[in-house]
């Protein structure tokens, strides 16, 4: 199965000039341009906030995009007021990360992989002139997550085709499309190709997530009075931050331990073994298939 996948990918890359061009930044200034898609106004920050901060620190251009407006993502409120609240939250969070913010005006829970939405995603990718695009896999517990993955797949390659969305110039090079990590097993589990240490930006990521209280401290759509009662109150900011830190230490430590062999591949056994917190990504078959030296250009954090 794995051999067949690699064979098909190799053949595709061999025959398609879009997939086999030398890799460099789309923009003339030489800085990378990265898009991280999430289904809701918090997903991109959770899944790629660490690596986004690392790129931003090096002067690269990062945008975190929510494909829906999050207007049903709370157990006590909904509609326009919630959408506006969540937009304000992610703007604060993204400013801390060093990224730009975009939230598409699609209702939470109603995202479909339609032609209309495919064209929206193509436009977002082209307008940003993206070198790297990250999104959910199309196998996830939430339909909005799944369809973000499908829409990314459907936009891959099409972003280079001149006569679709012809009012926006096509990209000269197909971006590297990546899936963010998850724990789902069917039809096949997440397979990490790249794992990045976020030890140096972990506190920065936590500070950003702290600015989205509707989702963590209040529980989002899955919250309740019982949930909120277990979280330190807003008056105890230090207690809240400690509660949040303990939660994310567990999550990002699990990610690092789960993908330790991939960290060792990119950092070497000694440095890889020392990584505490990580974010991992899988290369989508429908976009660029970079060689190892190309990945090091796109992820300029590896030794």
Identify the residue ranges that each predicted region occupies.
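Short glycine-rich anion-binding loops that position phosphate/pyrophosphate groups of nucleotides
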Residues: 138-140
């Amino acid at each position: 199965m794995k051999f067949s996948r690699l064979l098909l990918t190799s053949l595709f890359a061999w025959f398609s000039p879009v997939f086999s061009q030398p890799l460099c930044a789309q923009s003339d200034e030489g800085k990378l341009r990265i898009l991280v898609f999430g289904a809701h106004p918090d997903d991109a920050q959770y899944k790629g906030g660490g690596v986004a901060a690392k790129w931003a620190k090096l002067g690269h251009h990062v945008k975190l995009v929510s494909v829906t407006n999050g207007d049903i993502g709370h157990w006590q409120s909904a509609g326009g007021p919630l959408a506006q609240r969540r937009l304000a939250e992610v703007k604060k969070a993204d400013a801390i990360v060093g990224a730009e913010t975009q939230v598409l005006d699609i209702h939470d829970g109603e995202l479909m992989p339609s032609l209309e939405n495919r064209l929206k995603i193509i436009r977002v990718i082209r307008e940003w002139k993206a070198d790297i695009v990250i999104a959910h896999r199309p196998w996830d517990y939430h339909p909005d997550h799944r369809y973000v993955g499908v829409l990314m797949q459907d936009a891959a390659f099409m972003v280079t085709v001149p006569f679709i969305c012809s009012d926006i110039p096509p990209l000269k090079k197909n971006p590297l499309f990546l899936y963010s990590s998850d724990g789902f097993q069917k039809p096949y589990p997440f397979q990490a190709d790249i794992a990045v240490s976020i030890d140096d930006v972990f506190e920065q990521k936590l500070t950003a997530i702290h600015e989205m209280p509707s989702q963590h401290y209040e529980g989002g759509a899955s919250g309740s009075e019982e949930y909120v009662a277990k979280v330190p109150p807003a008056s105890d900011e230090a207690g809240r931050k400690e509660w949040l830190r303990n939660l994310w230490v567990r999550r990002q430590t699990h990610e690092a331990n789960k993908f330790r062999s991939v960290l060792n591949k990119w950092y070497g056994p000694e440095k890889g073994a020392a990584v505490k917190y990580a974010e991992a990504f899988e290369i989508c078959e429908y976009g660029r298939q970079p060689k190892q030296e190309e990945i090091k250009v796109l992820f300029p954090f590896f030794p």
